[in-house]
Amino acid sequence: FPGSTDRYLSSWGVQQAIEQYNPTVVKIRDRKLEVMRAHMDSKEKVRIQYASKFARTANYWKYYIGQTKGLKRMNVYDQKKALEDQFTAWVNVSDERVEKYGEALDILADAYYDNEKINEVRIFLNEAVFQGAEVFYFIYRIQDAIKNLPEDPKAKRLAINELKDIAREHFKDYNKNLDQDLFAELMELYNDNVPYSKQPDAFEKVRKHNYTKGDWHKFAAYVYKTSPFVSQSKFFAFLERPSVYKLEKDYAVRMFNSIMNHYMDKISEKRREVRKNLAKGERLYIAGLREMLPNKKFYPNANSTMRLTYGQVGDYTPGDAMHYDFITTFDGLMEKMDNSDDEFMVPERLQELYKAKDYGRYADEDGNLIINFISGNDITGGNSGSPVLNAYGELIGTAFDGNWEAMSGDIAFENDIQRTISVDARYIMFIIDKFAGATHLIDEMTIAPNRPRPLSAEEQAAMDAEDAMNDPLTIVNKLSTINYLGQEIPVIEMHSFGSAFDLAVAQFGSDSNTLFYWRGTVYTTEKR
């Protein structure tokens, strides 16, 4: 199932994404990546522990950078604003429309104004707390269970064992020093970027404390020295004699609860009101648009529901002097091999298969092994692994990503340059069969027959013209013409000059005075 799109986002929503939401997320993740990278570069064990965490953080860091660039490049704000201006003019034509839809855009404008005032607090809660230092999320998971430990000894022992299981999973890929630096850097970022009037009480206490005096690294050092929630051994020792008093006095717990209580007391209700008004404004606006543009098809966002998307495999040109083909091959994979970089490592077995060109039945007609292909399908987050079917209903690949230019696609889809990236089914089967040796899985599959490659539009036109040349019913007036020196001459659209010349001779005869036009040049039909 896909995640979510927001294709009918208003101009205020686009502006807020570009100017506030996206850059704030990027700023926080930028700092988080810097901290992780520094520790990962210093120790191999830490690099292995945090490789997937780093990748997850970088994924949406890059996504929001790309989305902002795409929205600006496509002038999405201006497009949305123009449609809203058109809508306003349409509404004001009649009192009935004003009564029905007149408040729609005002509701949206007011809701986004209110949202802007609380947005940073919400972003920092999500990005710097729940996805920041892992001590916060660990506290979130375990503190209620500690406060509600059963009195019965047997039940209490079972509850403590469950807490230990949570801790083992939590601390499996965890580094205390890295987490301490994350705590310091992200709390400092929170302190420096959210106005003091919108901050939890704990931040002012850290700024004014005689020991820390606003030094977040000093505060973090104290927290990670004294808290039982920053290492597995300390937590297990705490569970020997669990104490709600010690829990509530812990500085990491107090910081987390201060942030959460502030959000629930000061922000949560305002956020609910914003969401309610946004929903009302959007319902009115979309209903009005459908009435204003009765012939336009308005497809739903269909968030988190099963949906189908269709497209064509094809290349694209994202900018001047830039062009990307529609496939990548094993040759390209080997060109990028760098076994010092996790993202570009090629296992030895795969290298051996490449050197031997042992592709089996998975090579294409030219002997190449296709790895990925791109298409104009419209996908979003959550579509990784979605099957890609051809016109015959056969599985030809699985979608796993979008191109850089597609990062703005959740808000605005542009068919010319936004592409879905899919892994070719032949490469999947090659890995299962040749690389992994799991032939029993291949034996269970029904393999589709080889089919001829569909002709391109140019090739199809050439074939049609060739057929027409041999058709006695084909006459000159079926060809388009251009004016050349006052004379209408036929345009021959053929793949090659030879084919174009043969068709012209067949139609008009061989003559030095008979002209035809092919690819920007005028020729005679005279045979020499």
Regions inferred by a protein language model and the residue ranges of each:
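Terminal leader/tail segments of proteins
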Residues: 471-514, 518-528
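Terminal presequence/propeptide segments associated with secretion/organelle targeting
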Residues: 1-473
